[in-house]
Amino acid sequence: MDKNIKSLKSSVKNARKIALFSHENPDPDTIGSTVALLNALTKFGKTVSLFCETEVSGNYLFLTETENYNKDEFLPKNFDMVIAVDVATSKMLGKYEDDFLKHQNSFRIDHHIGGDNFAKTNIVLKTSACANLIYYILKLFKINIDESIATPLFLGLCGDTGIFRNNGTDSESFEIASKLTTSGANIRRVYDEFFDKKTVSVVKMTSNSLLNAEVDDNFKFAILTATAENYKKFNVPENDNLGNLPLTYLSCGYNIAVILKEKEDGIHCSFRSKPDFDVSCIASKFGGGGHKNASGCKLDCSLVDAKEQVIKEIKNYLKSNEN
C-alpha cells in the first residue's frame, strides 16, 4: 500500500485538475471523506470537481462544499486524475462508471476489503471508516488538518461506526475521533445539523413506515417500506436518508430489519442487523454490499416483487445460519 500512496502523492503533485467521486446513494462516510479530500487538495492549489450519481442534498448541505457536486461536466480528458472515495465497486459510480474506467490515471481510496480493484491504483485498508484512511493519507502528505477537513472526516467516522455503536467501532475509531476533535472538528454541528435534524415531513413519513412495517416473529426480521406515493404525500425528497430507520426494529428484538425505498430508478434497500448477523451476504445476492451490519442494494423491479425477493433471501440466510 505504501507504493500506491507514493503513486497517489506523485500524481497529485503533477495534476492540475482532479475529479473526486462518491458512491451512488451516498452515506456520511463517502460524502465526509470526499469533502475532506476536496478541501485538502484545494490547499495544494488544485482545481477539484465533485461527482456523484445521486443528487447530494438534505442534511448533507450543512457541509457547504456539497453544493458543488455535479456542477461540472465529467469528460475524462479534462482531468489529470480521478479518485473514487469509499467506492467498493465500479457499479457504485453509476453513470460515471464507464468514463472513470477509461481514465489512465485513476485511484480508488477505500476501506472495503472485498471490493473490486477497478482503478489503476487501489489504496485499500480495512478500517472502521474510509474517513480514517483519508486522515492517515493526509497526515502522510503533511497537510495541516483544520476544521474544514476535520469536521467532514468526523461526519464520515460517525456514519460508518453508527455514531460509535456498531461492530466496526474499535479503539482506532476513538483515537481518530480524538485527533479530529483536537484539530477543530465541529462535533456539535455534525450531530445537530446531520444526525438530529429532521423536518416535520420526514417525521410523519418515518412514522408511517414504522407503523406499517411487516414483521416475522418466527424468523425475527422486519420489513419497512417508503413508497413513491408516500414520498409525494409527505413531500419528502427521494434522496432524504431513511437508511437507519430499520434500527428501531433491532431495538425491539428483531435480528434483521430492512427498508425498501421506492424511487424513480428502482427499489433501494437498506439492511441493518444485530452484531451476529451478516446482512452484506443478503445484499450481495442483489449485486449490492457494504458492511456486516449495514448494507444496501438496488433492485430493478416493482416494490411488491422486491419485497418478495428480499424476504426470500432473508429467510434463506437465516435458515442456513440457524446453527
Predicted segments with their positions:
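An acidic intrinsically disordered interaction segment
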Residues: 1-6, 98-106, 126-134
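Conserved beta-strand scaffold positions in the cores of enzyme catalytic domains, especially
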Residues: 106-108, 121-124, 221-223, 259
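Generic enzyme active-site microenvironment
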Residues: 21, 25, 84, 108-109, ...
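Short alpha-helices
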Residues: 109-176
